[in-house]
Amino acid sequence: MNEDIKNNLNNSDEFNGKIIVGLDEAGRGPVIGPMVIASVKINENDLPKLHDLGLKDSKQLTKKKREELYIKISEICDVKKIVIDPEKIDEQMEIINLNKIELGAFSKLANHFIKENENISIYIDACSSNEQSFSNQFKAKLINKNVEIIAEHKADENYKIVSAASIIAKVTRDNVIEEYKEIFGEIGSGYPSDPKTKKFLKNYVHENKGLPKIARKSWATSKNLLKEIEESKIFQWVK
C-alpha cells in the first residue's frame, strides 16, 4: 500500500464518517492454551488517539506495557474477542487447517461490525504470506463484499489499528495462561520451543498417561509425547 495512505491511517485527524476496524490474533503456534482473535473498532477521526499511545506490535512490548495499553485501547475502541480453546482447535483441525480456523473467526468479528456500518475499512494481519489469496478468502466470508479490505502480512507492525488488536489478543491469551499456572503450576509460555513447557508436558504425560485438557492434542509435540507412552507400554509388555 502507498506510504501516504499508511501515514494517513496512522495520523488521520479528519472525520469522514468512516469506521476503521483492526483484526489480529495471538496463539497460533503454542501447544498449550487458546488461540485468541481480537478486533478493535474506532471512528476514523479518533485514530490520532491510538497514535498518541505509541502502539507497536504486541511482541515488541513488555508484559506490563501491554497490560497498560490494553486498558487504554479498551477505553478508546470497541473491543471484541473470540477465544478458541485447545479442545475446539483440535476438533476443527480434523476438518480444516489452522488458517481456515483463523479466517472463520476473523470473518465472524468483521461481520458483526459490517452489520452496523456500511462505511467501513478493515485492516487485518494476514496469516499467510500470499496476501491476495488471504484477502480473497476473507472477503468471500463477509456479508458485504464491497467493504474495503487491507490484508497484509505483519500488518501489526504497519498499522496502529492492527497493533491495537494484537495487544488485545496477546493480553487476553496471557491472562488465560496465568489462570492455567494457578492450577498446574509452571507451564512456561505454552510454545513447543519453551523448555518449561516441554518439561511440564513430559512430566504430566508420564504421570497421568495422557495430555492435560489445556494442551492441543493435534500438535506434533503432543503426538510425540503420546507416542513415547505407547512405545514404553509395548516395551514393558515385551519384557
From Swiss-Prot:
One of its GO terms (molecular function) is RNA binding. Its cofactor is Mn(2+); Mg(2+). Keywords: Cytoplasm, Endonuclease, Hydrolase, Manganese, Metal-binding, Nuclease. Residues 18-231 form the RNase H type-2 domain. InterPro entries: RNase_H2_suA (IPR004649), RNase_HII/HIII (IPR001352), RNase_HII/HIII_dom (IPR024567), RNase_HII_arc (IPR020787), RNase_HII_hlx-loop-hlx_cap_dom (IPR023160), RNaseH-like_sf (IPR012337), RNaseH_sf (IPR036397). GO terms for cellular component: cytoplasm; ribonuclease H2 complex. It is an enzyme of class 3 (hydrolase). Coiled coil: none annotated. Its EC number is 3.1.26.4. It comes from the Archaea. It catalyses: Endonucleolytic cleavage to 5'-phosphomonoester. One of its GO terms (biological process) is mismatch repair. A divalent metal cation binds at residues 24-25, 125. The keyword Iron does not apply. Manganese or magnesium. Binds 1 divalent metal ion per monomer in the absence of substrate. May bind a second metal ion after substrate binding. Its main location: cytoplasm. Transmembrane segments: none annotated. CDD domains: RNase_HII_archaea_like. It is found in: Cytoplasm. Endonuclease that specifically degrades the RNA of RNA-DNA hybrids. PANTHER family: RIBONUCLEASE (PTHR10954:SF23), RIBONUCLEASE H2 SUBUNIT A (PTHR10954). NCBIfam families: ribonuclease HII. HAMAP family: RNase_HII_A (MF_00052_A). Belongs to the RNase HII family. This is Ribonuclease HII. It comes from Methanococcus maripaludis (strain C7 / ATCC BAA-1331).
